[in-house]
């Protein structure tokens, strides 16, 4: 059996994770000295007070090394293999913690097989590759094929989101105070996205309505050009604007009801109130992954993944062969 492991920032609803047999390792939120497990929190209840948090923004932290090891050890003890897909390594140390944990477990269980994928994003932009791996597992594919399914999904996804205010981004050090003040005064509404594993600006418009319109038209252009495999509407804070946007705008575009899912507070507390959309297309979306020159984006991801591990953990055994195998599989 293949165990699929991820983190709570993927924002997969608890019931869905249980139904799909996805092991979720929780990150943490510390508010006023009290630590909460992200995976166990009622996100809507947390977000009710989000406006009161702006002058004392909670602190987030990654899973403990012990918790990460336990997730992999559960699989090893049962004689199962494991595929881990985690939050972008450029946003958190969670992926690196998974690398260390899997190595330690493998040293205790010599027959334990595992693969790790840097999800290169967060929220459902991270979850779509996980869903592809689950689908591959559930039709009987082997561990390498499940890994390949996740890797190939990464360049097919996009996450667009627009914060209601720039204040949280300023408080979190993402933008300067003057820029936040001026932006709020002129109702600047940036649309953010994730590119090469990092949050960046997708577009800038004036007013919340124009931001929603721009995200909708960009989504429509992408699915017209590259097809659609899945979509959810995300929110941070009040869910009603997201529900309305999903019902009135996004669902009619795709001809079915679109789910509305809260973003993990680990991400939400850095952004503040926001509405967004995370979707996966049938084909790679230009601009999601930009590094390198090879036309095969999935191939570049596999190479970058193993090179990143090699540079940080040079004592890993025989990664040259591992990289060659992944590249060979992806070329087929």
What are these regions (language model features)?
Residues 69-82, 219-228:
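Glycine-rich phosphate/diphosphate-binding loops that line cofactor/substrate pockets in enzymes
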Residues 50-51, 76, 137-138:
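Hydrophobic residues in alpha-helical segments
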Residues 3-63:
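N-terminal glycine-rich anion-binding loop in soluble enzyme alpha/beta folds
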Residues 3, 13-23, 27-30, 94, ...:
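Mixed-charge interfacial surface used for oligomerization/domain docking
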Residues 61-71:
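Glycine-rich, highly charged phosphate/nucleotide-binding loops
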